[in-house]
Amino acid sequence: VSGRPLPGFFLSAVLPRRFRSRVCRLCRRPVNGFRYCYRCNAAPDVARPDAAGFVSYAIKNSQAGQDMYRYKGMQPSVQAVNNVQLLLEHGLRHLRCVNQIVGTNVQAVTVMPSRSHYQSGAPSQLQKLCALRLPAGLPTVGIEPVAGATSDRKVDPASFVVPQPVGWSHVLLIDDTWVSGGTRMSAVGALRAAGAAKVSSLVLARWLDPGYGATPELVREVTEAGGWSSPQGVCPFTRDGVCPRVR
């Protein structure tokens, strides 16, 4: 692990206390007066992760948002790759936190494949970073999009296949960006159908579109209140950012 600090433009997905009731309790999307956003509320139980961690918020057109695209482009930006690697490293430092929340240790990791640019046998940029940074000895579980499946944002576990049966008690699903969440929850459901008893997720960036729904008002208010903070030192798996093992 490099130990380098995250660039200052990355924003923690943990908000000050007075704003926390205004984001979905599962995916942290801004909502108006509801515990869950529409998509998370409508998702079947089998598709909801047992714990969901978010390292940062990435606001559309911001430097952080651009990095989440540039790190996996046709000609990846070295700077963006390094920054996304730092997000991954930070999230992986909190494996003990998700272990405690779920009640059993992570026994294997699944890295989310691209549905729009999937090539069998060709690792994605995120899979390459995970191969470098995952703890030694932690097995990986393969998952593949079904032929013809598209990024339609629907929650459909049948849109993924897990080639080998999964007998682990706890599988961690890692992805770079959560937009609608449909793809992530579909993968969670597929892992459960393959035999995983518990499935948690770690997302490096929760995407925010300041032109959508309740997002612009919340982004403006948090900005005016000086409420954004760095992901550094914040637990991605808890709503208050406090590691459960030290409560």
What is the predicted function of each stretch?
Residues 107-110, 199:
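Residue-level signal for inorganic ion chemistry
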Residues 8-14, 22-108, 135-168:
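Active-site-facing substrate-recognition patch
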Residues 185-247:
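PRPP-dependent phosphoribosyltransferase catalytic core
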Residues 121-126, 183, 214:
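Residues at alpha-helix caps and immediate loop-helix transition turns in enzyme cores, especially N-
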